[in-house]
């Protein structure tokens, strides 16, 4: 987990250093207006979509665990 966070921070620093020469794009998220380099905005939207996909997969896995087959839950006591 620490490696993943560290690599994301390192990648973010590379993006910030590389963004000094990129053209700026104004992006509006409702009331929030963000002025950022174009590829940074594309990266943010990509990673947000990736994170939403991971959350949906985990939600489906948790639903499957809750809905086990009825035969496995029946215990016959004698």
Curated annotation (Swiss-Prot):
A GO-annotated cellular component = magnetosome membrane
| Residues exposed to the Cytoplasmic side | 60-78
Provide this UniProt record's keywords sorted from A to Z: Biomineralization, Magnetosome, Membrane, Signal, Transmembrane, Transmembrane helix
The signal sequence is 1-22
Question: What does the record say about its membrane topology?
Answer: Single-pass membrane protein
Its subcellular locations are:
Magnetosome membrane
Q: What happens when the gene is disrupted?
A: No magnetic response, no magnetosomes, no iron crystals of any sort. MamC is mislocalized in a few punctate spots throughout the cell. No magnetic response at 30 degrees Celsius, a weak response at lower temperature. At 30 degrees Celsius magnetosome vesicles are smaller, sometimes align in a chain with the filament, only a few have very small crystals. Other, possibly precursor magnetosome vesicles are visible. MamC and MamI mislocalized to 1 to a few patches in most cells. Deletion of 3 consecutive genes (mamJ, mamK, mamL) leads to cells devoid of magnetosomes or a magnetic response.
Q: Which residues lie on this side of the membrane: Lumenal?
A: 23-38
- Annotated transmembrane regions: 39-59
Stimuli inducing this protein:
Part of the probable 17 gene mamAB operon.
Q: Is Lyase among this UniProt entry's keywords?
A: no
What the record says about family reads: Belongs to the magnetosome MamL family.
Q: Read off the NCBIfam families from this record.
A: MamL
Cited function: Involved in magnetite crystal maturation, but not in magnetosome vesicle tubulation or formation. One of 7 genes (mamLQBIEMO) able to induce magnetosome membrane biogenesis; coexpression of mamLQRBIEMO in a deletion of the 17 gene mamAB operon restores magnetosome vesicle formation but not magnetite biosynthesis.
* Other observations noted: This bacteria makes up to 60 cubo-octahedral magnetosomes of about 45 nm in diameter which contain membrane-bound crystals of magnetite (Fe(3)O(4)).
Q: What name goes with this protein?
A: Magnetosome protein MamL
The species this protein was found in: Magnetospirillum gryphiswaldense (strain DSM 6361 / JCM 21280 / NBRC 15271 / MSR-1)
Its lineage opens with: Bacteria, Pseudomonadati, Pseudomonadota, Alphaproteobacteria, Rhodospirillales
Gene encoding the protein: mamL
């Amino acid at each position: 987990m620490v490696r993943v966070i560290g690599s994301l921070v390192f990648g973010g620093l590379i993006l910030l250093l590389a963004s000094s020469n990129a053209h700026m794009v104004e992006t509006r998220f409702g009331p929030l207006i963000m002025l950022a380099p174009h590829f940074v905005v594309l990266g943010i939207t990509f990673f947000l979509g990736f994170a939403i996909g991971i959350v949906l997969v985990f939600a489906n896995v948790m639903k499957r665990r809750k809905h086990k087959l009825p035969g496995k839950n029946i215990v016959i006591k004698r």
